[in-house]
Amino acid sequence: MSKVFVIDHPLIQHKLTLIRDKNTGSKDFRDLVKEISLLMGYEVTRNLSLQEIEIETPVGVTKSKVISGRKLGIVPILRAGLGMVDGILQLIPAAKVGHVGLYRDPETLEPVEYYCKLPVDVQEREIIVLDPMLATGGSANATLKAIKDRGVANMKLVCIVSCPEGIAAVQKAHPDVDIYVAAIDEKLNDHAYIVPGLGDAGDRLFGTK
């Protein structure tokens, strides 16, 4: 079973309160989502492997550590996941960025992939999947499957706000994928919105209805 990490750093929780507020405008919402993503990225990358190298400083030679091993990739789920990309890239600017787009079939209500563009060497990378909201888990599960189908074995899912239903759905479908969240909210309502949540993250990021 995958692990769930709740990142409850005071700065994240403060900024989370601001994005929950219905009076927060799109610009501030975008800035805050970026800042929260950056802060979450610190914990998401905590277990990256290191190797020791020798470098020369202005006053001598020393051994120091750098990140080694598997390369990283970032895959936002379109469109709301785009709001988290820049924050993660500030921490790992060398990461490649792919994209997965989904729409909901009006008859089956199941997510359908309409776009998937991943780095050519995606099989060699550890992939961080980004989506501000983990509600039913349908979009996350479809995205994780799409990436796995293209040969990726190592992934993490990073969401800002989640709920028990979404977490359970991802753990059932993808027990090998760890989940990182800033909050686990109470439940889903009858319209599949997280309660208390923060509304539609995509609409609030981009000022659409």
From Swiss-Prot:
Protein name: Uracil phosphoribosyltransferase
Protein's gene: upp
Classification via InterPro entries: PRibTrfase_dom, PRTase-like, Upp_B, UPRTase/APRTase, Ura_phspho_trans
Activity regulation (UniProt): Allosterically activated by GTP.
PANTHER family: ADENINE PHOSPHORIBOSYLTRANSFERASE (PTHR32315), URACIL PHOSPHORIBOSYLTRANSFERASE, CHLOROPLASTIC (PTHR32315:SF4)
Gene Ontology MF terms in the entry: GTP binding; magnesium ion binding; uracil phosphoribosyltransferase activity
Record-level GO BP terms: UMP salvage; uracil salvage
Binding, 5-phospho-alpha-D-ribose 1-diphosphate: R79, R104, D131, P132, M133, L134, A135, T136, G137, G138, S139, D200
